[in-house]
Amino acid sequence: MGVGLSTLEQKLTEIISAPVEALGYELVGIEFIRGRQSTLRIYIDSDDGITVDACADVSHQVSAVLDVEDPITVAYNLEVSSPGLDRPMFTAEHYTRYLGEEVTLVLRMAMQNRRKWQGIIKAVDGEMITVTVDGKDEVFALSNIQKANLVPHF
């Protein structure tokens, strides 16, 4: 389960994971963005990468399950995609997998009067992540991380 997810996102993750995994894909994570046009974004991956057809298959299966379960009370768009180069990070396992990589964090509550941080993932200890920012180690509670993405390098 993703750290820092809302109750709705936790419920959606539980509902969505089975059909995604049944199709042979990894559910990387989800985002539910509320607004005038709400969006449920599902990130999937596999060892062979993700094709447009894979996204369409997952979208079809997940739509059917969500129509039955009906956990979302507002109109929304469903998007299914690969994590991309700026891969979002949702779980402690994601941070562990990408130790030594550069990450951008947006915090729920500011630390040292900052909500945005960028640095190198140094360590993961349970619910805490250590990121080296400008040569100094900073420790963040995973539950305080609103959004995290790898920084692609070309």
UniProtKB/Swiss-Prot annotation:
The keyword Transmembrane does not apply. Transmembrane segments: none annotated. GO terms for cellular component: cytosol. Pfam families: DUF150_C (PF17384), RimP_N (PF02576). CDD domains: YlxS_C. Gene3D superfamilies: Ribosome maturation factor RimP, C-terminal domain, RimP-like superfamily, N-terminal. GO terms for biological process: ribosomal small subunit assembly; translation. It is found in: Cytoplasm. Keywords: Cytoplasm, Ribosome biogenesis. Disulfide bonds: none annotated. NCBIfam families: PRK00092.1-1. Required for maturation of 30S ribosomal subunits. Belongs to the RimP family. This is Ribosome maturation factor RimP. It comes from Yersinia pseudotuberculosis serotype O:1b (strain IP 31758). The gene is rimP.
